[in-house]
Amino acid sequence: LNLDKIPMIKLLKNETESELLIKRQKTKNNCLSKLHEISKVEIPLIAEIGINHNGDINLAKKMMIASKNSGCNFAKFQYYQKDVRIQKNNETEFLHETADGTELSLNDVLERSRLKKEDCLELIKYGESINLPVFFTVFDVESALIIRNMGQKIVKVASMDCNNYDLHSNLNSIGFETIIISTGMSDIREVSKAISIYDQNLEILIMSCRSSYPTSLEDVDLGEISYL
């Protein structure tokens, strides 16, 4: 699918959404994003630490230092409530094999890697001490409220939640200034609908993503970046 040849306006059925997207595009041209403003670099780099710390805060800090030394401008983690993120009937399914061959359920992985509120506060403070701002991907409203109350103004929505319109609606009203949305597995209609939910005063950053690891070269489609 060559997105460069498909006018966004024709893909949207809702005229209000179309008008909103056009207006948002006009207002954002030639403006630096919050990430540019904070990092003061032309291309901000975000270290996707996610849950790779395995719940070990000391390891998370070491990964932050490595990210800083590698030239990254931000570090991003995941913050979630496990009972909300995974359904009860899936807790023992989706086995994950660790490096030593041990099999863990998705429930085990999420529980082991889950950050507590005090962990998030510690990582934010540590990021300030090494000049590496921290922000989080959230998967539920409770987590979003918690990190907003920590003073966080930037939040990220994962690809799996791009079409979670209830989450977008709640993020719109919580008080964040910048919403970053990943778009892996979503089509342009879903992306457009997500954007249309947000008020004009919010900064929305759309990320071109591929939810396959590693991504084959024929699926990369870097031309999508300028389209989005």
Feature roles, as predicted:
Residues 2-228:
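Catalytic cores and adjacent flexible loops of soluble metabolic enzymes
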